[in-house]
Amino acid sequence: TPFSHGITKRIINEDLSAFEYVFCWLGNTDLLVSIIKLIEDKMNLEHDVQEVGVQLILLVEDGIRFYSSILPNLYKFVLKQSQEFSTEALNAHQRTLRMRGRPKIVLARTYQEAMEIYHKYQNNILGVITDVRFPKVERGEKDGLAGIKLCAEIRKNDPFVPLIIQSSESENSSYAVKYGCLLYTSDAADE
């Protein structure tokens, strides 16, 4: 594959603090738009939430290959929905406002980062998509149930926010039922 597990393991031991995000090229040109949108969303998030009440989708994933493949699809869906919604506007100014008011997508790579984002923006969370296994803190060991713990904590505060758990292990379905989550299983989840 273009971004092997060997490369992923080498990156883990590197100091990447100078970089906001690391992506892998999987041949999808939509990744470039996703990178730009992700950075724009992060930069504009606080202003857009406070001033306009924009909602956000929280994606919790530490797998570079996985978030490099899901973000283009997620952005394509959100942008398409926003374009369709903006056609209902009465004039050009309203259309522009509706497009700018699209849900922001925020990527968290640890439990701690996800909880900080959740607590700061919990009234504007449109939904959460989470992996099951990721570190609790930056550069920490992976916790095999971090995503489940995240869903449990969020569910305590909000019984209605949509939660999606993505996992390569169907055994996690009992957790999904317990916390009222949708479980998406795939054989291609990144380690």
Give the location of each predicted region.
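Conserved small/polar residues in nucleotide/adenosyl-binding loops
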Residues: Y184-D190
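Short, flexible/disordered intra-domain loops and linkers
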Residues: G6-I11, P72-N73, K136-A146
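Short acidic, S/G/P-rich loop/turn micro-motifs used as interaction or catalytic elements
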Residues: F3-H5, T29, G63-Y67, Q112-A114, ...
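Short amphipathic alpha-helix used as the core "switch/output" element in two-component signaling
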Residues: E116, V137-F160
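Acidic, metal-coordinating helix/loop segments flanking the phosphotransfer/catalytic sites
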Residues: F85-G127, P135
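Conserved acidic segment of CheY-like receiver
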Residues: G53-R65, I70-Q94, I105
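A short, hydrophobic beta-strand element within the central beta-sheet of small alpha/beta folds
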Residues: T1-K9, E20-C24, E61, L126-I129, ...
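Receiver (REC) domain switch/output surface
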Residues: I11, L16-Y21, L26-E46, N73, ...
